[in-house]
A protein has these predicted regions:
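Active-site entrance/lid segments in N-terminal catalytic domains of soluble metabolic enzymes
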Residues: 40-340, 353, 370-372, 404, ...
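Non-transmembrane, aqueous-exposed alpha-helical and coiled segments at domain scale
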Residues: 318-339, 351-359, 376, 389-393, ...
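Glycine-rich beta-strand-to-loop/alpha-helix junction loops that act as flexible
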Residues: 342-350, 368
């Protein structure tokens, strides 16, 4: 072998068979030009590890200025060659490439790197796309109270992506209306409905499952589960039949959103025999279906939910996803399921770099949340969309959750522009400290009625009682015998309505807005600053999704070059959001 060294440039050990003359090989690292965008593209300290082969132009010569290179790299459908020219690094489309051979002739240039095409529909696991009838491995997660609206779900379905309707917190009537609309509007397109764990309202969870089964909702997103429940297992097992090979074929599919290993283990395994026996005894599934369920995981897809808005354990994505992938592999080896569970990532997917990182770590698909609430199709209000558009990464805080208030479970919400988190925490502290409303010191009760309730405790209790008489009368039986339960239900009235005030843009309640949001919202705002997506009125879910996926392709192209030893200046990589027309031109 021969080692070539020139001032400022270190080349690796190059086999003599691939060596080329010093005149052709030598170049000096070129600094980016700070005074103009059309600068040489190489960064300082660039190292070319090894010449891959040789490249010869056809009709187009290599380009070396950053504007031209940016255009080529941004054309993600085009295969590219990175070569060494007499004037430095060049990038070219087309031409002839020869790998692993001696220099074929003087018209050939040293080939430093190659970039194959990478398009948005190539990201993720194609099995996820096939299973759900999608073009892209991209999903919008369910945001409760209809924030994950039917509008979002329809837009996603028509664009070849998967949208999940935010059924949590809604009445059976509202959910039924959404089913009617989406089944009529997305006849041959994919859609998903949320099923949230409701430990304080098990009857409502059962009623939602009954509705989904009766109306033929074939795909649900299960969220906030701490353990499997009989209604959830019933949904999965109902309709099971043996396939041609005897393996179970599920009619009802589940996307499980989890952040804990112990919960993920339950979804990546068959349902427990105890729950299956309970369902068989109740006549809700057949013995044959229960037997088939013993060789079927509880979910088809599992979302590793990192630091997200709403219910979250604030897990870091960079550790959570690999952990879930390893757990899936271990349980797949144990159970030998016919189709392995696919693992996606949610929480922090708000920039091209975030999406690219997820796919690079092995995510089968990505799920977005907070950024969709800021879009015009969300079930939120213009006031909330403006608040979200101003949020930074540090403008989030944890606050008590309405649906699991008594358990001390918290949700991540927006802190900027609202006092909800502080006021909700005060209610939780009073609940923990006192056995009843009457036991709370009078000055404290006055403040709660003035700031949070804006009415007397008994007036709010009357409203709350009327609500549960319709929704779940069994809750009232507990409240009639336990004053602490009664107090909790009134406090949950405030927590529950605070998100509805935000969704409706209630002008007199802005300081009480509960806006579920993760730090990804701040990252998104930083990414779109100075672009057409900076304005909340321009934020459409499909445009946001396509820009994230396209930008991820560009980021992955950059990473591919870096792995081959070629480091280009930042301006060579177009990751800023594009208008729909500009994006269409790039993807031609």
């Amino acid at each position: 072998v021969t080692v070539f060294r020139w001032p400022g440039v270190a080349f690796g050990r190059i086999p003599k068979a691939l060596a080329f003359d010093r005149t052709t090989l030598a170049f000096a690292p070129i600094m980016s030009n700070p005074h103009g965008s059309a600068s040489p593209a190489m960064t300082t300290q660039s190292v070319v590890r090894l010449n891959l082969g040789w490249w010869r132009p056809d009709r187009t010569a290599p380009v070396s200025d950053s504007i031209s290179i940016r255009g080529l790299i941004g054309s993600v459908k085009a295969p590219l060659a990175v070569v060494n020219t007499a004037s430095g690094i060049g990038v070219a489309a087309g031409g002839e490439t020869r790998l692993g051979v001696p220099n074929p002739g003087p018209e050939f240039l040293p080939l430093l790197a190659t970039l194959p095409p990478i398009t948005p529909d190539m990201l993720g696991d194609p099995a996820f796309q096939t299973a759900h009838g999608l073009r892209y491995s991209y999903m919008t997660g369910a945001m409760a109270n209809g924030i994950g609206s039917a509008d979002i779900v329809e837009e996603m379905g028509r664009a070849g992506m998967l949208g999940s309707f935010g059924a949590a917190g809604l009445s059976i009537e509202r959910i039924t209306q959404a089913i009617d609309r989406l089944q009529a509007g997305l006849v041959d397109k994919p859609f998903c409905f949320n099923l949230i764990h409701s430990p304080n309202e098990p009857a409502h969870e059962s009623a939602v499952v009954e509705l989904y089964l009766r109306r033929g909702v074939k795909l649900i997103e299960a969220s906030a589960y701490l353990d499997l429940t009989a209604p959830l297992v019933r949904y999965r097992v109902a309709g099971l039949r043996p396939g041609p090979n005897g393996k179970p074929v599920a009619q009802n599919r589940i996307v499980a959103k989890v952040s804990r290993i112990e919960v993920a283990t339950k979804f990546l395994s068959p349902p427990s025999q105890r729950l299956l026996n309970e369902l068989v005894a109740g006549g809700q599934v057949t013995p044959e279906q229960a037997k088939l369920a013993e060789s079927l995981p509880m979910c088809d897809d599992l979302v590793a939910e990192a630091d997200s808005g709403g219910h979250t354990d604030n897990r870091p994505a960079i550790t959570l996803l690999p952990t879930m992938l390893a757990l899936r592999n271990r349980l797949q080896s144990q159970y030998q399921f016919a189709v392995p569970v696919r693992i996606g990532l949610a929480g922090g997917i708000a920039t091209p770099a975030g999406a690219a990182a997820a796919f690079a770590m092995g995510a089968a698909f990505v799920v977005t949340g907070s950024v969709n609430q800021a879009c015009v199709e969300s079930g939120s209000s213009d006031a909330v969309r403006r608040m979200l558009a101003e949020a930074g990464q540090a403008d989030m805080i944890m606050a008590p959750a309405a649906d699991m208030f008594e358990m001390g479970v918290k949700v991540q919400v927006l802190k900027r522009g609202t006092m909800f988190a502080m006021r909700a925490q005060k209610l939780y502290e009073l609940y923990r400290q006192y056995p009843s409303w009457e036991a709370i010191p009078a000055p404290e009760r006055v403040l709660v009625e003035k700031n949070q309730l804006r009415a007397t405790f008994e007036e709010i209790w009357s409203t709350t009682r009327a609500f549960f008489e319709r929704r779940d009368p069994t809750v009232l039986a507990k409240a009639d015998t336990d004053p602490r339960v009664k107090m909790a239900l009134v406090f949950r009235w405030y927590l529950g309505l605070s998100s509805r005030w935000a969704n409706a843009g209630e002008s007199g309640r802005q300081l009480d807005y509960q806006v579920w949001c993760g730090p990804s919202m701040g990252a998104f705002n930083e990414w779109v600053k100075g672009t057409y997506l900076e304005s909340p009125t321009n934020r459409a879910v499909v445009s946001v999704a396509r820009n994230l996926l396209y930008g991820a392709c560009v980021v992955l192209r950059r990473q591919s070059l870096c792995q081959q030893g070629v480091h280009l200046a930042d301006e060579c990589f177009p990751t800023a959001p594009l208008t729909p027309y500009e994006l269409e031109q790039r993807l031609k």
